[in-house]
């Protein structure tokens, strides 16, 4: 048998992207292409060696050119020594060829007639032809055309993590390129690490920025590779278009698509469904965080079940006897999963996978310290710090998900007194962390300051308007005009804080993490419908309109039930309010709140020069219903709270929150039986929308 000469490997060509190929339209082969850019979707380019042409393509010809249905034969003479090949060698070659045919069949890179010819001709002549064909085909060029399903992929390809069946040959460059990976790591440390605290910052810097090994794991370890790709992916999703062009000279969608493909490919290799490594689960959680920011569909909500099961299989909820470093990493990871589970349940909406009992019984927050205070060799316990630390915002988020589960998904918490008590405990735990926090010091301090105030408003709103109302097993209280105004003010404060992050330059790094919540938006729309305070409605309606536009832009293509219901309710409220309010409340700004005009139109402080612009004289923590001294007095309900001394000069809080410190909101409200008008209108609108959708489905069938 003649020995084949070495063949030059073909360079990968830039072919039509996946979407243009599926839609069968001409692709201009740009990155991203014009068709995908105009459609507003992510362009996934395809790069692979071109198929044989000219004289090479004539090797596959038809027996009868006049017969279009004739099978294809291979015009290669059988080798002279074919009869001397051992049976086992022939079987091995046939097995290899069948594997190639199976892989090519999945990607449609070879004609169906040729596959049929390979499968049906089983005589000796066909076997000799197959053997000759195998020797004449560049096996490497065929392997890159279709992906192989590894038996250790843990089923992730079945879950759709791979996106499509045509892998991009340049996916690894985003990880192997030292400069790109270092820049994305820097973006992660700036934009993601302050709000999603599951990694150890110094260890990450030594690994991705200084080139050292990560926590003693060998280089090329599957878990380490998947974590690096997940860091690049979530960092790419946190970029703005301006930052993407400034750092990488390309669009955000292009860098996100490449990073996502790299992350999904490395996750398949690391098999998070089967891996016992906590590092692999960290990578999977970061993938879910990035996917949720990029894709508003229910994909992350579905995949959360796997993250919760894996965490329980690794026994993350249980306090172990590991060293201090491992304990902190396990606590951070488990509470981050609890937070993501709570967030995805609110966005759908549905009940969380982790029950209230599981979340509260395993609630053991990590230390309120900086990452520089400990390392993997730390064996002793480290006490909590005072003031703002690397973990302040994360600790507040952990308390938010714990209180949110009790207020929204716990049927046992029915009486208003206990609900308001939960709110008060939440305020004590979170606002304690706000002591000594100067919002003018850093963008992170500014963001933490305003988000904590937003969380407090959200907790108070959930105490009065929990999601449990939609289950009809909790009586809806009726409120008078003043109390209804307080509800509208709470909802407006949440929407204003969201808009502030999207307009103030100090919130640019964290805008990817902040979206318009549909619950306060729905409550604000409903309250505007029945509110009798004309001046309040006149101030509120532009904020509601702008928040609605941003919400619709963010959930485009998903959450249809909520989106359609909100849109119909908005049309109903517009018809009532706009004729009476006139054109003074019209909104013509961008729904992304990216301009100064939007900030001025919404009366949101854009860049306050000092703290005096966001607070007023006398607005102190001591003005709350609980005194500052109570913050430093430990008790059973504060066993998990950081100990801090009484501040001699406590920081000031948003005056809107202080104006709502009434006995009704803090001490509890009286039990009333009739339904409130605004919530009744909201539930009526939901019922009407569901009935209309059912009628539409019947008409289609």
UniProtKB/Swiss-Prot annotation:
Species this chain originates from: Arthroderma benhamiae (strain ATCC MYA-4681 / CBS 112371) (Trichophyton mentagrophytes)
Residue ranges: DNA binding: 17-43
GO MF assignments: DNA binding; DNA-binding transcription factor activity, RNA polymerase II-specific; zinc ion binding
Protein name per Swiss-Prot or TrEMBL: C6 finger domain transcription factor nscR
SMART domains for the chain: GAL4
Pfam families per record: Fungal_trans (PF04082), Zn_clus (PF00172)
Subcellular location: Nucleus
UniProt-listed InterPro entries: Sec_Metabolite_Reg (IPR050613), Transcription_factor_dom_fun (IPR007219), Zn2-C6_fun-type_DNA-bd_sf (IPR036864), Zn2Cys6_DnaBD (IPR001138)
PROSITE patterns tied to this protein: ZN2_CY6_FUNGAL_1, ZN2_CY6_FUNGAL_2
PANTHER family: UNCHARACTERIZED TRANSCRIPTIONAL REGULATORY PROTEIN, ZN(II)2CYS6 TRANSCRIPTION FACTOR (EUROFUNG)
Keyword Transcription regulation: yes
Any one of the GO BP annotations: DNA-templated transcription
Gene Ontology cellular component annotations, sorted alphabetically: nucleus
């Amino acid at each position: 048998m003649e020995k084949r000469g070495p063949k030059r490997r073909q360079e990968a060509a830039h072919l039509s992207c996946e979407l243009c190929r599926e839609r069968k339209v001409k692709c201009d082969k740009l990155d991203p292409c014009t068709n995908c850019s105009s459609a507003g979707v992510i362009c996934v380019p395809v790069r692979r060696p071109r198929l044989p042409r000219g004289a090479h393509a004539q090797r596959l010809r038809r027996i009868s050119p006049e017969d279009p249905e004739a099978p294809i034969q291979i015009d290669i003479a059988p080798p002279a020594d074919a009869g001397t090949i051992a049976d086992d060698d022939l079987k091995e070659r046939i097995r290899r060829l069948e594997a190639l045919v199976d892989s090519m069949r999945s990607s449609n890179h070879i004609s169906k007639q040729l596959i049929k010819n390979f499968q049906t001709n089983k005589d000796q002549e066909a076997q000799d032809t197959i053997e000759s064909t195998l020797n004449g085909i560049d096996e490497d060029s065929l392997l890159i055309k279709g992906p192989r399903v590894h038996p250790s992929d843990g089923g992730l390809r079945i879950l759709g993590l791979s996106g499509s069946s045509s892998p991009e040959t340049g996916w690894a460059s985003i990880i192997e390129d030292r400069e790109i990976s270092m820049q994305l790591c820097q973006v992660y440390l700036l934009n993601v690490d302050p709000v999603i605290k599951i990694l150890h910052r110094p260890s990450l810097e030594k690994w991705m920025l200084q080139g050292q090994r990560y926590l003693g794991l060998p280089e090329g370890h599957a878990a380490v590779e998947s974590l690096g790709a997940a860091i690049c992916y979530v960092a790419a999703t946190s970029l703005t278009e301006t930052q993407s062009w400034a750092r990488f000279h390309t669009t955000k969608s292009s860098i996100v698509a490449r990073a996502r493909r790299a992350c999904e490919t490395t996750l398949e290799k690391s098999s998070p469904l089967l891996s016992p490594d906590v590092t692999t689960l960290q990578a999977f959680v970061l993938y879910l965080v990035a996917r949720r920011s990029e894709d508003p569909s229910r994909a992350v909500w579905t995949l959360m079940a796997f993250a919760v099961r894996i965490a329980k299989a690794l026994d993350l909820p249980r306090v172990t006897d590991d060293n201090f470093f491992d304990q902190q990493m396990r606590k951070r990871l488990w509470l981050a999963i609890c937070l993501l589970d709570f967030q995805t349940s609110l966005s759908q909406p549905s009940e969380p996978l982790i029950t209230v009992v599981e979340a509260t019984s395993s609630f053991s927050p990590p230390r309120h310290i900086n990452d520089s205070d400990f390392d993997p060799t730390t064996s002793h316990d480290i006490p909590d710090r005072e003031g703002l630390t690397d973990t302040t915002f994360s600790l507040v988020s952990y308390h938010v998900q714990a209180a949110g589960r009790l207020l929204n998904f716990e049927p046992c918490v029915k009486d208003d007194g206990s609900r308001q008590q939960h709110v008060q405990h939440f305020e004590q735990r979170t606002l304690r962390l706000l002591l000594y926090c100067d919002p003018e010091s850093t963008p992170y301090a500014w963001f933490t300051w305003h988000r904590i105030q937003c969380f407090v408003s959200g907790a108070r709103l959930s105490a009065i308007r929990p999601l449990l109302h939609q289950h009809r097993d909790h009586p809806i209280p009726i409120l008078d005009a003043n109390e209804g105004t307080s509800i509208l003010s709470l909802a407006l404060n949440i929407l204003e804080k969201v808009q502030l992050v999207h307009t103030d330059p100090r919130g640019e790094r964290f805008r990817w993490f902040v979206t318009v919540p549909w619950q306060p938006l729905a409550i604000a729309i409903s309250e505007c419908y029945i509110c009798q305070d004309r001046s309040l409605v006149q101030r509120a309606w532009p904020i509601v309109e702008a928040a609605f536009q941003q919400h619709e832009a963010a959930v485009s293509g998903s959450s249809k039930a909520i989106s359609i219901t909100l849109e119909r309710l908005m049309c109903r409220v517009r018809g009532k309010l706009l004729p009476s309010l006139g054109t003074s409340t019209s909104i013509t700004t961008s729904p992304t709140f990216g301009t100064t005009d939007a900030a001025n139109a919404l009366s949101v402080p854009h860049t306050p020069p000092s703290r005096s612009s966001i607070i007023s004289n006398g607005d102190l923590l001591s003005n709350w219903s609980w005194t500052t001294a109570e913050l430093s007095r430990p008790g059973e309900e504060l066993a998990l709270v950081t100990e801090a001394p009484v501040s001699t000069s406590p920081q000031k809080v948003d005056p809107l929150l202080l104006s709502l410190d009434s006995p009704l909101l803090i001490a509890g409200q009286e039990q009333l039986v009739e339904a409130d008008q605004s919530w009744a209108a909201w539930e009526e609108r939901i019922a009407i929308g569901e009935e209309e959708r059912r009628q539409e489905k019947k008409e289609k069938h």
